[in-house]
């Protein structure tokens, strides 16, 4: 279950498959990592019922913590809980997202991305 949540969720934050940012995400802080060509981006994402996340990747790692949970619907139509208090990590260049928030609760996440500086935060997954 935790693996499925991690794969499907993280970045609930993308509105379009190749968007560089998301209408769901409010950036709180961005800083360069010392001695690297990477940066850390801390954000809050709020996804309202009916909002969807497209399949996407990040050029680095994304860690998230569910501040306020709800229910999500997977591409196959199955509805699963997305519970408050769960933490997960999406690894570099691993496709995730592709779900819809259902029910009456807005899902709220704290996200921390450690990504390659100068690359888009969100990108389309490569073709299979």
Predicted region positions:
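Ligand-binding loop in jelly-roll beta-barrel domains
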Residues: 94-118
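A short, N-terminal "cap"/entry segment at the start of jelly-roll beta-barrel domains
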Residues: 2-44, 88-91, 120-128
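Extracytoplasmic
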Residues: 37-42, 61, 77, 93, ...
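Short acidic-glycine-tyrosine-enriched beta hairpin
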Residues: 47, 77-93
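Short beta-strand His + acidic residue motifs that chelate non-heme Fe in jelly-roll/DSBH
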Residues: 55, 73, 90, 96-103
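A short beta-loop-beta micro-motif enriched in histidine and acidic residues
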Residues: 37-38, 50-65
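Glycine- and acidic-residue-biased ligand/ion/polar-headgroup-sensing regions
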Residues: 59-76, 84-86
